[in-house]
Amino acid sequence: MKVTTLTLALLFIPCFEANAQRSMNVITYNIRYNNPGDNENSWPNRREDVLKLLKVHKADIFTVQEALYDQMLNLKDGMKGFDYVGVGRDDGNVNGEFSAVFYNSNRFLLMENGTFWLSKTPKVPSKSWDAALNRICTWARLKEIETHKTFYVFNTHFDHQGVIARKKSALLILKKIGEIAQRKEPIILTGDFNLTPEEKPLMLIRQKLKDSRQVSVAAPKGPIGTFNGFDFQSKLESRIDYLFVNKYVEVDNYHVLTDSRAGRYPSDHLPVLIEVQIK
């Protein structure tokens, strides 16, 4: 009888593990565009540091802002097993900055994807209102191979000058999320919003989605601020990079990463990592 009981118990263990939820690490990172004028902080001097950070923190999905095409190729080559979706904001192909979504292709399948412009004509490269530059939002619908769960990741970079443009962009993204993600599925919205938490466009977003810092099960780790300006002595008080989620995403951990080498950060922004479970 004891042998039978033990055998049954062992048989049930694999089933329990197979059905257990798997967490995933999602990182948003403004990697700073490849600007030779940055001198010692130029991309060739920090490229390997960015790649090391993504690997050390075991990113399953990471989103980038400001990435030029050569940087996209560096990331694709350096992160083996990762694919991406995204286009350059200036021509819908390879010109201009990307707001791309990278994903581990050994863990996820790409189901759908697209890019829209934060403008009055979102289907074509364009800018509107008081925006200084073309701005985009790239999205992907992914399926986890093991669990067959599907979810959406949206990634964006709001204008750095246009006050009206930032408000209109927030409203447009919420509208587009409603149109694209009509299924009751998990949603993660990431990006550099060029907004601090108390500003109205972010308040509009928080009416529909949850700020991952505020809903993290564990206490948030790291500084409040996410912009360092390549200043290693920065007080890190300016928070402009965010990950938002809907009710189908549980945020277990939130961490603003401060990895550095020889007194230098890999970018003028700090990456933000959340550990999540898809419900």
Protein language model annotation of sequence segments:
Residues 23-35, 111-116, 149-158:
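Active-site-proximal beta-strand elements of phosphoester/diester hydrolases
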Residues 32, 68, 157-159, 193-196:
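Catalytic metal-binding/acid-base residues of hydrolase active sites
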Residues 28-48, 94, 118-132, 159, ...:
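Acidic/histidine-rich helix-loop elements
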Residues 9-18:
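Hydrophobic h-region of N-terminal signal peptides that target proteins for export
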Residues 107, 164, 168, 175-187, ...:
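Metal-dependent phosphoester-hydrolase catalytic domains
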Residues 2, 18-78, 89-97, 171, ...:
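N-terminal, active-site-proximal structural segment of metallo-dependent hydrolase catalytic domains
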Residues 63-65, 86-87, 188-192, 211-214:
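Active-site neighborhood of phospho(di)ester-bond hydrolases with catalytic His/Asp-centered motifs
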Residues 61, 65-154, 255-256:
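Structured beta-strand-rich core segments of catalytic domains in phosphoester-bond hydrolases
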